Amino acid sequence: VLSASDKTNLKAAWDKLGGQAANYGAEALERTFASFPTTKTYFPHFDLSPGSAQVKGHGKKVADALTKAVGSLDDLPGALSALSDLHAHKLRVDPVNFKLLSHCLLVTLASHHPADFTPAVHASLDKFLATVSTVLTSKYR
């Protein structure tokens, strides 16, 4: 459960991303594909080379979903319900992949905002991404 402090940290951290959220989403995907090559199997129709339009496009989708989630911290299941259905029933993404992408997103954010990535912010972002992952996999049951 996200505390009031976590919610404050998340909103402040997300505000600092500014217009870079989509770029960070794409970079996190690139890190995921490079570090965990099996994740590429879900994108056989994509050009997965760094900087490709398709990776950038999907990175924007990831960033937009997380931005929506940050704006709906009190109702993440409601905010992410359609996305959960999509990943569980249509795309059938292995739940472990959400954890892998979450890790790569944390690395990406820390590399671009080291001064802002305090232990408290890191913990709040980690809890948030774990909660988002749990919500996205809730329809698998």
UniProtKB/Swiss-Prot annotation:
**Which CDD domains did the record assign?**
Hb-alpha-like (cd08927)
Q: Which residues carry this modification: Phosphotyrosine?
A: 24
Give the GO terms filed under biological process for this record.
hydrogen peroxide catabolic process
Entries under Gene3D superfamilies matching the protein: Globins (1.10.490.10)
Extract one GO cellular component term from the record: blood microparticle
Family designation: Belongs to the globin family.
Protein name per the record:
Hemoglobin subunit alpha
